[in-house]
Amino acid sequence: DIVALAGNDFATAPDFPAEIRAPRGTLFGVSGYQVQFASTEIHTPGDAVNAMVAMNPAGFRSNLEYVEQGGIIIVNEDEFTTANLKKCGYEEDYNPLKDDVLNSSYKICKVPMSRLTRESLVREDEDVSVKDIDRCRNMFALGIVSWLFSREIEPTIEKIVEYFGVVKKQPVIAQLNS
C-alpha cells in the first residue's frame, strides 16, 4: 500500500517452494516475495534485483545470482551461524558475509535483526513468547526497506493494526508489529 500511496506502479510475485515441509534453513525450503515498484508503468518482471533482503543464509544463497552487481543486500546477520551456513551447503569455515569479493560486488548491509527485534520488544511486564517476537523480524526488515526507499511507514502500521488487531483478533501481535 505504501508504494501505491506514493503514486508508484507496482507488481508482486510470491515464490513458494514445491517442498511443503523442507528442513528449516535448507535451500529446498526457501520462499520469497518479489516486490517491484517504479514511477512509470511496469510491464515486465524486470531483469535483475536492485535490492534483496535475506533473512537467512539459505535465502541469501538461493537468490544472490539474481542481484545486479552493485545491488543492495540486507541480511539478518544473526542467522549466519556455522550451523545455518552448513545446512545450505557452504563449506566449513566459510561465511559469505566475510567474503571480500562479494563485499566489493554488492552493498551488503549486515543487520542483527533477530537481536534488535528481541531487544526492542522484550518487556518483563508482558507475557510474550520469543517465538512471537521473532515473527516480528519481517516487520523490522520492512521498516529498513521503507526507510531505504523513503517510504512513509504510517499507512503500513495502520494496516498491520487493522489486520492483526481487528481481523485476526490478536491485539498483542498487532502491538508487537507496529
Residue ranges and their predicted role:
Residues 1-178:
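Active-site cofactor/cluster-binding pocket
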